[in-house]
From Swiss-Prot:
Pfam family, one: Ricin_B_lectin
Role played: May play an important role in stabilizing and/or regulating the cell membrane during Ca(2+) stress or certain stages of development.
Record-annotated Ricin B-type lectin domain positions: 25-145, 116-248
Localization per record: Cytoplasm; Membrane
Topology relative to the membrane: Peripheral membrane protein
Chain spans, region Disordered: 1-22
Gene Ontology CC annotation, any one: membrane
Protein's organism: Dictyostelium discoideum (Social amoeba)
SUPFAM superfamilies: Ricin B-like lectins
Protein name: Putative calcium up-regulated protein H
BP term (GO), one: response to cation stress
GO terms of molecular function: carbohydrate binding
Statement: the UniProt record of this protein carries the keyword Repeat: yes
Length: 768
């Protein structure tokens, strides 16, 4: 290959049952607590890790992932527990499916964790985790319990638990700068401030919403100290423990390289002040300068993940008689088990409460004390159930209103974008991404109030994923025919409504879950864990959500009609800015129809974008939810690029939270290597020459930042005389690694008459 040149210029389950997985992938998250209490016989210790990959007994709870084949993964899924080569200590290593010492059996009946390679049991030796023959000591006894996983892949705030005048204070990038090595500080949380919005990735990085590869990192030492550091932003680095973080049971954000150091701040949170954040050792476990709340908290996700706590049992005597009498009295003899109706749709719990409250002890029940105890308990349960149901009814009302105009909205947008909705053309339609973008808009524009809706909605999504795979009906489709798009959206809407209903029923059937949920209903609205909807501006919330959903539908439909035309800096373009153009240091991007590079979108369409806060940079670079293919274009043809119409330039879209890289080769010749930022697309911007008419094949290999394979495929460029090139993925060439999914490739023909290249966009998602 010749002429290579860079042209870009620059449920009520038992604990044991919960610890079982139905998948070969890491699925269920848990923590392990030792019955060993230390020298003071008080301090609890948990199975944890150190920065040397040695496993230790620590006061900090660590979340692990259990697979059905017995592997115990770190929460990031990158490493597994194994016995060291000496056969004694336990350490973290990469997965080796052929190693039996990486297989463990958790016995929740006898509180033992046994290694299948040597038959020994998990033990503690001077706070180091080891394996040893069964000895009956407390150091070999472990209680395991479900842990709701730290939500990854969702955007939100990290707010300080210190509140001043009811103002939120959050982790912030100074001045919303996208430059690396920018200080991370404390500021009051403000609407539409991307520098305050973060995402915890699956490998423990904390990603900023400001830019794709911008992450939280350790900054310079404070006065030369080895235990006190400033925080700043940096480029995402592979396997760098200084950029990887965890959250412990004290709501402290600790660093994986310095596990004893946590994020905090020093000073007073004054009005409109900026305070430097630091990495240091907290003065105590309850030092609020080092305690954080992830907002949304997804508190419901935590609640439904806990060990079930049944209602007080009434099995005999006057207790049972009282319960059955009150049940029959309240339900007009419909049932003697009133608790079975807490989830009933067509029953009035308010009516039941009134009857139970006014009931008197019948002569057939001898113990008025037992009757009174049961009566008070059922009254409390009904009060709790009424408020819990009201929370979900309000959410369902919001959600139903959001999608009530779905069919007409989709039709109107299709007409505006000039899309044939009866077509069998495939589009990328990931419903989960659409819902996530709605929740992001709510928390971004309405930090107080919007997070409550996001809390319920995202918890419902997480709850659906925690259900058994045979029952879960989530949004698993990444591509769908246009003619089936509305059906697809409606089906997934109904599934998510069902998930919320199922989560509500699970809560109403468990005394512990119902009590905890009820308590959240009376927290102040500005508390990140609150479910208190009193006083919320639902009109504003609905308006923001409706706009976000409309934008999500535009993201699905737009690539069927439009693409981006890129011209390198220094070459003539008809427009460099305006409603359908954007320029940066590399060149100019223009939106036009796929067939005609001089046919631009109507103002009504562009107004829906720019008037609703869509970032031009994100749009034209196909970042976040946008996925438009990009064609290389020269409006004034030069001899140097006169064969541009013969070429095809691929774009890789990374919908995941981990950076990727891709390389395109032809017959062994490397045509270019490119990094794809998280949630961004990367356009292959290296000019190359191509041969005669017919098929020409180019191989593309995609890896993540750690050099792990993601996908491989072959691009087929077909040349015909006096026509622009045709581009596609060669049949049978696509190989996708487990854990990833490739959406519908967007393939657009080049043009001989208008002198632009073919384009192909390949979207890559993280699959469950």
């Amino acid at each position: 290959m010749i002429n290579i040149e860079d042209i870009s210029k620059s449920s009520n389950q038992s604990e044991e049952k919960q610890l079982k997985s139905t998948s070969s992938k890491p699925k269920y998250s848990f923590a392990a607590k030792s019955l060993f209490k230390g020298s003071n016989n008080i301090t609890p210790y948990y199975l944890s890790t150190s920065n040397t990959f040695q496993c230790v007994a620590s006061e900090s709870i660590q979340t692990w992932l259990l697979s059905d084949d017995g592997h115990i993964f770190t929460s990031s899924g990158n490493f597994v527990l194994d016995v060291s080569s000496g056969g004694y200590f336990v350490e973290l290593v990469q997965l080796n499916s052929n190693s039996k010492t990486q297989i463990w059996t958790i016995d929740t009946t006898n509180n033992k964790i046994q290694n299948q390679g040597n038959g020994n049991y998990l033990d503690i030796d001077c706070f180091n985790i080891c394996v040893a023959p069964l000895n009956g000591n407390a150091t070999q006894q472990w209680t395991t319990f479900r842990r709701a996983p730290i939500p990854t892949g969702n955007w939100g705030y990290f707010q300080s638990e210190q509140l001043g005048s009811n103002n939120y204070w959050g982790l912030s990038v100074l001045n919303n700068s996208t430059s690396y090595n920018t200080s991370v500080v404390m500021n009051k949380v403000q609407a539409k401030s991307k520098g305050q919005i973060w995402q915890m990735t699956s490998d423990g990085h904390i990603l900023s919403r400001l830019d794709g590869n911008l992450v939280l990192d350790i900054g310079p030492s404070i006065n030369g100290s080895t235990t006190n550091y400033y925080l700043n932003t940096n480029v995402y680095k592979a396997n760098d423990l200084m950029q990887q973080w965890g959250i412990n049971e004290n709501n402290q954000i600790f660093n994986q390289y310095y596990p004893n150091l946590c994020i905090g701040f020093v000073g007073q949170l004054g009005v409109d002040s900026t305070v430097n954040c630091v990495l240091a050792q907290p003065s105590s476990a309850c030092d609020t300068c080092f305690q954080w709340i992830a907002n949304p908290t997804y508190s419901l996700n935590q609640i439904v993940s806990e060990v079930p706590e049944p209602f007080p049992a009434y099995t005999s005597g006057d207790l049972l008689a009282s319960y059955q009498y009150l049940s029959n009295d309240a339900t007009s003899n419909f049932t003697d088990d009133i608790r079975s109706l807490y989830t009933g749709i067509n029953v009035s719990l308010q009516s039941f409460l009134s009857i139970v409250t006014n009931a008197t002890c019948p002569s057939s029940i001898h113990s008025t004390e037992d009757f009174s105890n049961v009566q008070n308990q059922i009254k409390t349960e009904l009060i709790y159930a009424i408020d819990v149901r009201l929370v979900f009814e309000n959410y369902s009302g919001f959600y139903s209103k959001l999608f009530s105009q779905g069919s007409s909205n989709l039709t109107n947008l299709a007409n505006l974008i000039n899309v044939d909705m009866s077509s069998n053309q495939m589009v990328n339609a990931n419903y989960t991404d659409a819902i996530t973008s709605i929740f992001y808009s709510l928390i971004s524009e309405i930090p107080v109030g919007g997070s409550i809706i996001a809390n319920i909605g995202q918890s419902a999504v997480e709850f659906g994923e925690l259900m058994s795979q045979s029952n879960y009906q989530g949004a698993s489709t990444y591509q769908v025919e246009l003619s089936q798009l509305y059906t697809h959206l409606n089906t997934n809407y109904e599934n998510e409504m069902a998930n919320a209903q199922s989560m509500k029923d699970t809560i109403l059937q468990d005394w512990g879950m119902m009590s905890k949920t009820y308590a959240l209903c009376f927290l102040p609205t500005n508390d990140p864990s609150s479910l208190n909807m009193n006083g919320l501006d639902f009109e504003k919330i609905s308006d923001v959500a409706s706009v976000a959903y409309e934008i999500a539908m535009i993201q699905m439909l737009l690539p069927t009609t439009y693409q981006i035309y890129f011209t390198s800096a220094g070459y003539w373009v008809p427009y460099s800015d305006g409603d359908f153009a954007y320029s940066d240091n590399s060149g100019t991007y223009i939106m036009a129809t796929i067939k005609y590079s001089n046919s631009y979108p109507p103002k009504e369409l562009t107004d829906k974008l720019w008037n609703n806060g869509v970032s031009k940079q994100e749009f034209f670079l196909s970042a976040y939810g946008w996925n438009l293919a990009t064609s290389l274009t020269y409006y004034n043809t030069t001899n140097q690029y006169s064969n541009i119409f013969k070429l095809a330039f691929p774009t890789i879209k990374n919908f995941t939270g981990v950076p990727m890289q891709f390389v395109m080769t032809n017959d062994g010749d490397n045509l270019g290597n490119f990094t794809v930022k998280t949630h961004f697309a990367k356009f292959f911007s290296t000019y190359y020459s191509v041969g005669d008419l017919g098929h020409h094949y180019f191989d593309i290999a995609v890896t993540d930042i750690n050099k792990n394979k993601v996908a491989n495929f072959t691009v087929d460029i077909k040349l015909k005389a006096l026509e622009g090139s045709y581009v596609s993925i060669k049949t049978g060439s696509l190989v996708v690694q487990p854990g990833y999914a490739v959406g519908n490739p967007i393939c657009n023909q080049g043009s001989y008459s208008l002198m632009f290249s073919a384009s192909i966009l390949i979207p890559i998602y993280k699959s469950e």
